[in-house]
Amino acid sequence: MADKLTEEQISEFKEAFSLFDKDGDGTITTKELGTVMRSLGQNPTEAELQDMINEIDTDGNGTIDFPEFLTLMARKLKDTDTEEELIEAFRVFDRDGDGYISADELRHVMTNLGEKLTNEEVDEMIREADIDGDGQINYEEFVKMMIAK
């Protein structure tokens, strides 16, 4: 399944993997997974984190390596996000709950993920998704952006 990914997708997933792999050792542990999820406003229990790791950990060593991560991401792409998942993702970004993702909200979430973006990069991301030109991203624009990926 992972062999059906484009080079661009693999490159993007490598970047995402490195956000999780905080110590850069090539594996994601439950501790690293928990850190990223908490930075996104989730609060998983140790058991939930272990379940997530076990679901992806095909070689049974207790951690996720990049090939296992790619398999998961390929599966996620194939399953295309359900509306519920999209709403949940939108809420992570829309911190004040006003129905719009502002540049500040986008910058905050990306910084929590360890992505240090310049103001120009944040503005560019907003511009790319902002169909109606109001300077922020509404739910409809967010869905179009996520489906287009």
Curated annotation (Swiss-Prot):
InterPro entries cross-referenced by the UniProt entry: CALM/Myosin/TropC-like (IPR050230), EF-hand-dom_pair (IPR011992), EF_Hand_1_Ca_BS (IPR018247), EF_hand_dom (IPR002048)
Residues that, per the record, bind Ca(2+) 1: D21, D23, D25, T27, E32
Positions contributing to Ca(2+) 2 binding: D57, D59, N61, T63, E68
Locations listed in the record: Cytoplasm
Main localization (coarse): cytoplasm
Coiled coil stretches, renumbered: none
CDD domains, sorted: EFh (cd00051)
Domain EF-hand, chain residue ranges per copy: 8-43, 44-79, 81-116, 117-149
Keyword match NADP: no
Modified residues (N-acetylalanine): A2
Residues the record lists as binding Ca(2+) 3: D94, D96, D98, Y100, E105
A GO term from the CC aspect: apical complex
Molecular functions per Gene Ontology: calcium ion binding; calcium ion sensor activity; enzyme activator activity; enzyme regulator activity
Superkingdom as given in the UniProt entry: Eukaryota
Record keywords, A-Z: Acetylation, Calcium, Cytoplasm, Metal-binding, Repeat
Sites where the protein binds Ca(2+) 4: D130, D132, D134, Q136, E141
Protein family per UniProt: Belongs to the calmodulin family.
PANTHER family per UniProt: CALMODULIN LIKE 3 (PTHR23048:SF0), MYOSIN LIGHT CHAIN 1, 3 (PTHR23048)
Stated role: Calmodulin mediates the control of a large number of enzymes, ion channels and other proteins by Ca(2+). Among the enzymes to be stimulated by the calmodulin-Ca(2+) complex are a number of protein kinases and phosphatases.
Protein name: Calmodulin
Source organism per UniProt: Plasmodium falciparum (isolate 3D7)
